[in-house]
A protein has these predicted regions:
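Compositionally biased terminal segments of proteins
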Residues: 1-227
Length: 227
């Protein structure tokens, strides 16, 4: 873990603030991307505005978890219009808590369940440990989000940027994907094949990654993941 990860301070602040809910929620999203980077020479990931987490809970239980958040100093971010967003009063950090079950809030990501099932304890230092998405689940959830809310816009999608950063900064990802369930592996493969076939992708790739000199490496890894 790199101490200069731009998202680490906010992630630690939220992890501290949720208290024992750390044993229940799984941290996902762009704020965790830097923790998945294993190449010490990799460029820093993008700084995110919020910290995301998911939880396996039915409607009643999810509301009880929301009540616990309120008791821990979180308030709903009404102005944002984001139904799952909270603000931590003390730190002013944004926290998006999303249920795995799409019936609870009316939306989800089909790989959230897999992300919860495969989550691993991850140390943030100073005795602080969270449950965090694995690299394969991160890629699957981000590609799903790219196709959904990003509408496949390769130039404007932070989700795609996060995928490319992890592909670039985690050499072992290809081997990790080989051991994932077939349904996840096939979905990732299909999404990446579509991405690689995009008419503008090859020309846009150098501008989508932190270090344009790594374009050939990233492209080679994407092709292996798509094969």
């Amino acid at each position: 873990m790199r101490r200069d990860d731009p998202n680490l301070p906010n992630l630690c602040a939220i992890a501290e603030a949720v208290g024992d809910l750390r044993d229940r929620v799984v941290f996902v999203g762009g704020a965790t991307a830097g923790l998945l980077i294993t190449d010490p020479a990799a460029e820093l990931v993008r700084a995110t505005q919020d910290v995301d987490a998911i939880v396996e809970a039915q409607l009643g239980e999810f509301h009880r978890i929301e009540e616990q958040l309120a008791a821990r100093g979180f308030v709903r971010d009404i102005e944002s219009g984001v139904i799952c967003r909270w603000i931590h009063r003390e730190s002013r950090n944004l926290f998006d808590l999303m249920p795995v079950d799409s019936h609870v809030l009316g939306f989800s990501n089909r790989w959230y369940g897999y992300a919860v099932d495969t989550a691993r304890p991850t140390s943030l230092g100073d005795g602080l440990t969270i449950l965090m998405v694995t690299a394969p689940a991160f890629i699957a959830t981000k590609l799903e989000a790219f196709a959904d809310r990003g509408a496949g816009d390769i130039l404007a999608s932070h989700d795609l940027e996060d995928v490319l950063n992890v592909v670039d900064g985690r050499e072992e990802l290809t081997k990790e994907m080989e051991t994932t369930p077939a349904r996840v592996r096939d979905a990732v493969r299909t999404a990446l094949k579509q991405l690689l076939a995009h008419a503008d992708f090859n020309n846009a790739l150098p501008g989508l990654i932190a270090d344009a000199d790594r374009t050939d490496t990233v492209l080679r890894r994407l092709r292996r993941l798509a094969s």
